[in-house]
């Protein structure tokens, strides 16, 4: 059975190699790749702009920005044991982009993270949405035609995107796993700064919480009541759980 599955995978890869060509290697710099270096409260981040770029994701561990059949180092990620590994381990080298391509005219901002962004509230609020704040340091959001998000199935995802005014421009990576755009934009991870997921989650940048508060908590009455929202983060076997009170 295993041999049969492997043969099937090899056939699928050859088919997509024929359609889109094999992934050759990786690239850091090019005339079509711009990298902006910014700081938010002494934290360093990169913003990546790639012209005529494909984005492929398996929706869980790997996302590849692909320019001329090369993976762009920086915005691409390949999570192994919760840590972003070498770009050489990206799944597209082994399996290619095993989904048919969808073309979007215009600029796309990728808000993709690991599989946690698909359904986990914490990862949505702290991994996905803060990338908007990072990008705003250099790019006017009005110039972005589409926002590629992990998922759109849950109410909290729809609600937060509506409050940010970008819901109608949002597309789900669950539906569109392989896309092409005139320009693809990505960022560094908002809070994964080291090779220790446990350390990073215990030292979340304060600006993320302040940004979330400024965007989503509005006091309707200054006299009568205050709405309090508490996030309790627990580390259990390197898994982040969220409780609301």
Where are the model-predicted features located?
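The feature primarily captures lumenal catalytic ectodomains
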Residues: 1-245
